[in-house]
């Protein structure tokens, strides 16, 4: 830690306080995440250290790079590249009645998918994607932050400030207690973020797990074994769930064209095995008119 000075506290993440800092010799500005673990006495589990060390290998233009892992007084500090704005703050800053430019929505979605495909190809899941951990710079680049931390530390039910961790972007298989899940969980989250890029509003904003599920069911219909084989045998599926009929996504997401709605519907397919993959999503016609500079990134 002696290589870095803390400049100021910039926020509170899922796992602890985040500081803006500076490397003493290079002058490079960084984000320093202090990881607060449940069991302070035992120190940091070696499994977490191993997991985190692997994340230093994830180098991609759309992934916030982990530059250093430091220990101080049995506290773990993760040193990341610094970006000053997250997507939630950006969406909140757009004046009422105005929306993000449709070409920027497309560019951001494409970059998010590029980042996710890179990580999925290395068998790393995110599991907790949301606008707060998508960081942007002033050049139109968006990067995914906090990759792999869920596996290293678990996802707490509450942030250490006792704020409840958001469920709005969580996939139905996770909400229904599936023990085995994979890369499609991230695609679902990206789908809900895609809708929010277009409308500035969370697509499904539940305030409990059951409320979250019912908001999804009301929009997309209550799933059954016909549309999603074996869903009825998932741990938290109840035969007493109200049986809603599928509605139209277009009524929930007004600012997307036909191709955009088609891609969104493929990202929000109930059956994880049928949900579009990141790689397939990048080749969807929605991106046909995307600036070739972004495709080359």
From Swiss-Prot:
CDD domains: STKc_CDK1_euk. ATP binds at residues 10-18, 33. Residues 4-287 form the Protein kinase domain. It comes from the Eukaryota. Disulfide bonds: none annotated. It is found in: Nucleus; Cytoplasm; Mitochondrion; Cytoplasm, Cytoskeleton, Microtubule organizing center, Centrosome. Phosphorylation at Thr-161 by CAK/CDK7 activates kinase activity. Phosphorylation at Thr-14 and Tyr-15 by PKMYT1 prevents nuclear translocation. Phosphorylation at Tyr-15 by WEE1 and WEE2 inhibits the protein kinase activity and acts as a negative regulator of entry into mitosis (G2 to M transition). Phosphorylation by PKMYT1 and WEE1 takes place during mitosis to keep CDK1-cyclin-B complexes inactive until the end of G2. By the end of G2, PKMYT1 and WEE1 are inactivated, but CDC25A and CDC25B are activated. The active site is at residue 128. Its EC number is 2.7.11.22, 2.7.11.23. The keyword Metal-binding does not apply. Plays a key role in the control of the eukaryotic cell cycle by modulating the centrosome cycle as well as mitotic onset; promotes G2-M transition via association with multiple interphase cyclins. Belongs to the protein kinase superfamily. CMGC Ser/Thr protein kinase family. CDC2/CDKX subfamily. This is Cyclin-dependent kinase 1.
């Amino acid at each position: 830690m002696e290589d870095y000075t803390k400049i100021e506290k910039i926020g509170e993440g899922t796992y602890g306080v985040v500081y803006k800092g500076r490397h003493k010799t290079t002058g490079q500005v960084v984000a320093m995440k202090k990881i607060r673990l449940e069991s302070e006495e035992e120190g940091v589990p070696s499994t977490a250290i191993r997991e985190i060390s692997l994340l230093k290998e994830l180098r991609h233009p759309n992934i916030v790079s982990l530059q250093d892992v430091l220990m101080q007084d049995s506290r773990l500090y993760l040193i990341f590249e610094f970006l000053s704005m997250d997507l939630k703050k950006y969406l909140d800053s757009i004046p009422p009645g105005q929306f993000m430019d449709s070409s920027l929505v497309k560019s951001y979605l494409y970059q998010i998918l590029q980042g996710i495909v890179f990580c999925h190809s290395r068998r790393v899941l995110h599991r907790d994607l949301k606008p707060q951990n998508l960081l942007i710079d002033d050049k139109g680049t968006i990067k995914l932050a906090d990759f792999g931390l869920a596996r290293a530390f678990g996802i707490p039910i509450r942030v250490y400030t006792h704020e409840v961790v958001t469920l709005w972007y969580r996939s139905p298989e996770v909400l229904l207690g599936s023990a085995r899940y994979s890369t499609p969980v991230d695609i679902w989250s990206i789908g809900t973020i895609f809708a929010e890029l277009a409308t500035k509003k969370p697509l499904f904003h539940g305030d409990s797990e059951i409320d979250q599920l019912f908001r999804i069911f009301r929009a997309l219909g209550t799933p059954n074994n016909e549309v999603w084989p074996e869903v009825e045998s998932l741990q938290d599926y109840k035969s007493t769930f109200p049986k809603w009929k599928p509605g139209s996504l277009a009524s929930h997401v007004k600012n997307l064209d036909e191709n955009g709605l088609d891609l969104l519907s493929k990202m929000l397919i109930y059956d994880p095995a049928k949900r579009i993959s990141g790689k397939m999503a990048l080749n969807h016609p929605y991106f046909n008119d995307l600036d070739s500079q972004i495709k080359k990134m």
